[in-house]
Amino acid sequence: MLLAYIGPGAGFVLGGTFVALIVGIFTGLVSLIRWPVRFIYRTLRGGKAYREAKVKRIVYLGLDGLDPKLCEQFMAEDKLPNLQRLRAEGGYSRLRTTFPCLSPVAWSCFATGANPAKHNIFGFLSRSTKTYMPELSSSVVRPPSRVLEIGKLEIPLGRPEVEMRRKSVPFWKLLGEHDIHSTILRVPITFPPEEFNGHLLSAMCTPDLRGTQGSFSFYSTAFTRVDESQGMRIPLRKTETGFESKVLGPQGPEGDALEVPFSLRRAKSGEHWELEVDKRTHELVPGKYSEWIPLRFSSGMLGSAKGIVRVLITSTEPEVELYMTPINIDPESPALPISYPENYAVYLAKLMGSYSTLGLAEDTWALNERVIDEQAFLDQAYLNHGEREQMFFNALEKTPRGVVACVFDASDRIQHMFYRTLEPDHPANRGRETEAYTGVLEDMYKRMDDLVGRTMQRLDEDTLLFVLSDHGFESFQRGVNLNTWLHQNGYLVMKEGAQFDQDFFRGVDWSKTRAYAVGLGGLYINRVGRESKGIVKRGEVDALKRELAAKLDGLVDPERGATAIIKVHLSSDLYKGPYLNAGPDLLIGYNKGYRASWASVTGGVSVEVFEDNSKAWGGDHCIDPDLVPGVLFSNKKVLVDDPGIEDLAPNTMSMFGLKPPRHMEGRPIIE
């Protein structure tokens, strides 16, 4: 999950449930009345649209983070037979990624065919130019604009306002304008869903019901008070019949978290446990995840919000401990729009049962915090993966023409948490048993290969298949705190007496600070006219950027004697577009084994520039892009030597006989 759970806050879900129901019923009736006319019109026009097409259908199977080095190694060892067959029948190439090498950036380039300065996504996090605080880069959720105040109560009138910060136009919307249908499943940076001629389920950066990017709850009989510093740590109180506690949900009208009480007891048989919540009893087996459990957070007559969680008993002695996933938005009754059309999420839930809707559904932070172990993390990742497979194969069946695009996240999340098993000397392995997990990555690659094989079996000769990843992977052993380096070199100034190791730039004297770092991508200049407390004048900006780049190029880690930063680039040298100034001014090309430190990401200033990364998150890709390309397999031969992820959008347009629009910078790669 994003460090510190950067999110829009809670309290955004109440008050709109009844309104949404009425709107949904009305919309459904209108659609039903219009359907025959639309069907005939689209059939006639759609037939015309496909006459110029070179293929009937394009399928994008996205395996986030699949690494070319490991793919090539396992293929050489004959361990990935389906990818080997796909390579032989069509082709394989390393796929040039983006800078920064982050999923939000890369998949936005995939969707739009444009560079970050045109689509406005430079990473997971941006920053407020008013407060310097980190912000979610992809979307913002605001409370309803109209509120009824009754004393201390604030009753929202209507649904929350959700703004998409990604700019430019994705290829599926352009295809839809020509009546070419697309089904888009869990492609990052699709929240909130945009209206187009097709179906879409949102992905990365879709919040949980509390408004965060994924805040778990952990219950223990050892806790005496609620602690919200990293996830939610909540006491589990003993009763005459077992234990009891509460689920803390979104904020209610009075500002406090709405609660759902629950009880936990050992079953009379002694073989399992029973969790009772919302008048339903759910069977729990220690060490095994529950099914999705529905929760209803009520504020009386003011409305309610529904969520779903999975629960895992992690210990029964000496303490009873319970892990609960972040509260996912219930797909059967979404509190926020998570699909287009809105009833598509409901349709999938009716078809296959409840499923994870959180953008970052695999709880990496719970493993970092050691509230779950490695096996529990793997179990969760593959449960989510199984849900995605059901959606994907349903889409293949229901979309015989047009585009099907689905991104699977397990490959990325598992490598983040288990890449360290390839390196016995990784700092995160100290004092931990890792030998049992040395085969996890190979097993994951074999599972992804099996998915590719089952996909190929379902395709006909008129379907163009791409299997791709947005980036590769490398080790993350050492963190680099750029804010500390800036401080030590006089570019970032602390107030007199300010303490170190604080997040969100606490203690920074902006009246004397010329540069700062936030997020994973790079550095910002504290500019006059852009930042609220900027001090660097327009005529001084370019010289300062080049000065910083020259000093940071080749930065050496004194403890290891290794080069930590290969090259620093001016973003203005790499990208052109209307949103250039929204991104970092300098992009940092880290070497293998290095990355921005955890503290630096959220605006912290540490005592030392370099530090060991001791978290389970021991693999990463936010480094120099030449070190972490993605992969591109196809059942047709790729005709260019250096394909980039931005090439796929214009290639899609071209394959359907359409001229790519001017904003797309890539080129067609298959005739």
Locate predicted features.
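Histidine-centered active-site microenvironments of extracellular/periplasmic hydrolases
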Residues: 469-520, 575-629
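A short beta-strand-to-alpha-helix junction
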Residues: 163-166, 446, 494-519, 534-546, ...
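His/Asp/Glu-rich, glycine-adjacent segments
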Residues: 114-431, 514-563, 597
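Metal-dependent active-site segment of extracytoplasmic phospho-/sulfohydrolases and closely related
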Residues: 445-486, 562-571, 579, 587-589, ...
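Polar, surface-exposed loop/tail segments
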Residues: 193-196, 475, 543-547, 558-583, ...
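Active-site-proximal N-terminal segment of extracellular/periplasmic enzymes that hydrolyze or transfer
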Residues: 41-92, 101, 177, 664
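Short, strongly hydrophobic alpha-helical membrane anchors
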Residues: 1-10
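Short, structured active-site-proximal loop/turn typified by the sulfatase FGly-forming signature C/S-X-P-X-R
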Residues: 72-121, 125, 183, 493-494
